[in-house]
Every structure is written in structure tokens, then in C-alpha cells.
């Protein structure tokens, strides 16, 4: 009987061990499945995150940079870096483009849009969006992969001078759009970049895109009251419409080749050469 008792105890112990092994296997399989799902997803930046950016103009939480009175689209958060993609417009080696820019600046002085943009003139081919630090390397690799076989394109500025208003209606820009005959080249490039951005759930470029070279800008005020700040010029909100043509007889410049695409992540500039 004692022998049978030991036998039954051993058998129970084996059953218990088998049950534990099965449970462990189930847990391992479940964990493996969950890990695979996590790898397949890009977390941290849901679409609702960017929907909030679109609504930012309705809140008093807009961030004012007191250095230059610019309104940021989103608040600075440690670990987030403002990012955008663009190509540069040659000005140092192109007198015709420099003369065109000076002509637009004179128009800006006439209509009070006269705050100079940065000295490095460029055309953006993405929105500005925040990227998390741990996504930077993956995003950079994917963007390079997307543009790896992209050929250089020819671009020509148009004869029109237009105004563009930013998303949160805080600034107005005096700009030169792309000549319509060359527009399809850049739109195809934007489509490729959008395909990369969508993988990370970053916002795509604007609907009905109108890529442009911004020359000067002004802050927008919601009323007609003059500001006490003599160093900053303001434009009433309803004075101009977005994409309104101010002048359509600018001197036509020659085309130029875009053979390098840049992107800024925070203060770091990177680029890739096109074929």
C-alpha cells in the first residue's frame, strides 16, 4: 500500500508539473504574440495627437516665442524635436533669383509684410511635426530609403507673388509659388515623402498643395488696433485671403535643379543627394 501511495503521489506531481509547463508555454506564446504586435506598430503618436494641433488656434495655450513674436504650433516638450523636410533655393550663385527676392521684399514693404525670413531660402515639402527622440534613427533610415532612387528635378519659380497664411492663422507670408509647368515634379516628390510620413503616423502635406518660397512675413492680429511694439508689424486677420495673388507680373527666372533634399530635426540638418 505504501508503494501505491508513493506511486499516486508521483503521478499527481507529474500532472501538476505538466500543468505548470502548459501554462508557461501559453504565457510565453501570448507574450511572443504581444511583442510581435508591438513591433508591428509605431506607438506614442496617435492621429488624435495631431488633431489637437489642428485645433490649437481655438485655445489660449498657443506658445509665443518672445524673441521674434512667432507663435509655435505646439509646445516644446523634452524629447520631442520639431522636424520638416525641404530643399534649398540657390541664391548666392543666381543673380536672377536674388533680384526676384528683392522685388518681392519691395512689394512686402508696400503692404506691410516686411519681416525677413531666414537668410537660407528654401521650399518646404512637408509640414512641421514633432518627432520623438527614439524614432529619429528609424525615421531617418526610412526617409533615406524612400528617396534613394529619386531623380533630381527641375524647378522654376512663377511670376506671381502670393500670400499664404499658416495653420493657426498667426502669421502671413509673402511668397512665390512654383511655376505650374514644373509643379507636377515636386508634387510627385511630396507624394513619396508623404508615404514615408504615413508609416509613422506623421501628418502629410497639405491638401491642394501649393509649394512656395517664402520671402517675408508678418504677425496677424484679430483686430485693427495698432500694437505698441514698433519692431513687429501686424496685419489684420481679414485683410488678405490665403493664397491670394498680390502681383502677377514678376520677372520670370530660369529654372534650377533640385539635387539634394534636406530635413531638420531640432537644430540638426541632414540631407540626401538625389540621382
From Swiss-Prot:
Task: Identify the residues that bind UMP.
Answer: 206, 210-214
Which cell locations does it reside in?
Answer: Nucleus
Q: Give the top-level enzyme category.
A: lyase
Tell me which Pfam families the record gives.
Answer: HVSL
Entry keyword set: Hydrolase, Lyase, Nuclease, Nucleus
Reported EC number(s) for this entry are 4.6.1.-
Please provide the Gene Ontology terms (biological process) for this protein.
U6 snRNA 3'-end processing
Q: Which InterPro entries match?
A: Usb1
Report a single Gene Ontology molecular function. poly(U)-specific exoribonuclease activity, producing 3' uridine cyclic phosphate ends
Q: Where along this sequence does the record place binding of AMP?
A: 122-124, 206, 208-214
Q: Which residues form the active site?
A: 122, 212
Give the CC-aspect GO terms.
nucleus
Region (Disordered), start-end ranges: 1-25
Q: Primary place of residence?
A: nucleus
- Which catalysed reactions does the entry list for this protein? a 3'-end uridylyl-uridine-RNA = a 3'-end 2',3'-cyclophospho-uridine-RNA + uridine
PANTHER family recorded: U6 SNRNA PHOSPHODIESTERASE 1 (PTHR13522:SF3)
Q: Which family does it belong to?
A: Belongs to the 2H phosphoesterase superfamily. USB1 family.
What does this gene product do? 3'-5' RNA exonuclease that trims the 3' end of oligo(U) tracts of the pre-U6 small nuclear RNA (snRNA) molecule, leading to the formation of a mature U6 snRNA 3' end-terminated with a 2',3'-cyclic phosphate. Participates in the U6 snRNA 3' end processing that prevents U6 snRNA degradation.
What this protein is called in its record is U6 snRNA phosphodiesterase 1
Q: Source species, please?
A: Dictyostelium discoideum
Amino acid at each position: 500500500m505504501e508503494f501505491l501511495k508513493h506511486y499516486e503521489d508521483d503521478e499527481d506531481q507529474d500532472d501538476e508539473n505538466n500543468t505548470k509547463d502548459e501554462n508557461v508555454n501559453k504565457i510565453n506564446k501570448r507574450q511572443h504574440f504581444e511583442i510581435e504586435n508591438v513591433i508591428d506598430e509605431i506607438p506614442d503618436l496617435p492621429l488624435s495627437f495631431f488633431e489637437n494641433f489642428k485645433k490649437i488656434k481655438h485655445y489660449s495655450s498657443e506658445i509665443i516665442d518672445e524673441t521674434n513674436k512667432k507663435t509655435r504650433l505646439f509646445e516644446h516638450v523634452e524629447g520631442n524635436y520639431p522636424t520638416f523636410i525641404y530643399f534649398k533655393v540657390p541664391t548666392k550663385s543666381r543673380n536672377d533669383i536674388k533680384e526676384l527676392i528683392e522685388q518681392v521684399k519691395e512689394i512686402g514693404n508696400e503692404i506691410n509684410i516686411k519681416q525677413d525670413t531666414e537668410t537660407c531660402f528654401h521650399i518646404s515639402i512637408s509640414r512641421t511635426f514633432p518627432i520623438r527622440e527614439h524614432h529619429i534613427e528609424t525615421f531617418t533610415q526610412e526617409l533615406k530609403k524612400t528617396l534613394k532612387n529619386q531623380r533630381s528635378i527641375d524647378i522654376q519659380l512663377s511670376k506671381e507673388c502670393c500670400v499664404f497664411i499658416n495653420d493657426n492663422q498667426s502669421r502671413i507670408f509673402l511668397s512665390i509659388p512654383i511655376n505650374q509647368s514644373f509643379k507636377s515634379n515636386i508634387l510627385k516628390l511630396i507624394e513619396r515623402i508623404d508615404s514615408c510620413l504615413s508609416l509613422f503616423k506623421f501628418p502629410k502635406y497639405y491638401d491642394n498643395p501649393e509649394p512656395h518660397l517664402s520671402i517675408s512675413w508678418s504677425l496677424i492680429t484679430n483686430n485693427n488696433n495698432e500694437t505698441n511694439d514698433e519692431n513687429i508689424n501686424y496685419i489684420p486677420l481679414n485683410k488678405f485671403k490665403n493664397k491670394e495673388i498680390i502681383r502677377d507680373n514678376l520677372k520670370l527666372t530660369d529654372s534650377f535643379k533640385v539635387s539634394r533634399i534636406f530635413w531638420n530635426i531640432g537644430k540638426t540638418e541632414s540631407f540626401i543627394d538625389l540621382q
